[in-house]
Amino acid sequence: MKRLISCLTIICALNASAAAETTSNPCSRWISFLKPVCQRIHQTWAEGHDDMYFSGYAWHNRYVYSNEKIKSYNETAWGGGLGKSLFDEKGNWHGLYAIAFLDSHRHFEPAVGYAYLKTASVNKDLKAGLGYSVLVTSRVDYDNVPIPGALPWAALFYKRITIAATYIPGSSREGHENGNVLYMLGKISL
């Protein structure tokens, strides 16, 4: 519960900080080659739609883990979160998110990040996208130290509903198995 309150406090502080920004150029203090990153993140935060995330499935690669290990893992990674997202002038998707879910050992795992997807329209209502997410998470088995990462990301968009997936790579060394998980989540744009 303390971690959940901490995550919510951080989200509220970020929101208050963004709302308090009164300069016409919030990225003016950024290094020149990073300004486009700042500007896109600021645009996503300021102009994006509110999103609600739902997670619920984490598939552990059967080619890496033994049946005994798989039986001990939690594959119902229930959780949720909030975010902001938009489709840019080229039709590509940008999202900011803060989520929390139950990890493979049924421990609370928070994550905050940015995701980008290059999209292709199948028809008026259906889009598919491939891209990446840059995030920070923390895990009990790593002493809750913030861990930065980057992961591949894929999604199908249908009107306001999105189904997304990422693959968390890992090690398959005997006795040191970790990662190698397909993580699925859904999103509703509010």
UniProtKB/Swiss-Prot annotation:
Q: Which domain of life is it from?
A: Bacteria
Mention any one GO cellular component term assigned to this protein in its UniProt record: cell outer membrane
- E.C. number: 2.3.1.251
* Swiss-Prot/TrEMBL GO biological process terms: lipid A biosynthetic process
The catalytic activity, as recorded, is: a lipid A + a 1,2-diacyl-sn-glycero-3-phosphocholine = a hepta-acyl lipid A + a 2-acyl-sn-glycero-3-phosphocholine; a lipid IVA + a 1,2-diacyl-sn-glycero-3-phosphocholine = a lipid IVB + a 2-acyl-sn-glycero-3-phosphocholine; a lipid IIA + a 1,2-diacyl-sn-glycero-3-phosphocholine = a lipid IIB + a 2-acyl-sn-glycero-3-phosphocholine
Do you know which SUPFAM superfamilies this protein is assigned to? OMPA-like (SSF56925)
Which protein family is it in?
Answer: Belongs to the lipid A palmitoyltransferase family.
Listed transmembrane segments: none
Can you say what this protein is called?
Lipid A acyltransferase PagP
**Places the protein is found:** Cell outer membrane
- Active site, renumbered: 60, 103-104
Q: Where is this site: Role in lipopolysaccharide recognition?
A: 69
The record, for InterPro entries, names: LipidA_acyl_PagP (IPR009746), OMP/PagP_b-brl (IPR011250)
Signal peptide start and end residues: 1-18
| Role, per record | Transfers a fatty acid residue from the sn-1 position of a phospholipid to the N-linked hydroxyfatty acid chain on the proximal unit of lipid A or its precursors.
Subunit architecture: Homodimer.
Q: Which UniProt keywords apply?
A: Acyltransferase, Cell outer membrane, Membrane, Signal, Transferase
Q: Name one GO molecular function term.
A: acyltransferase activity
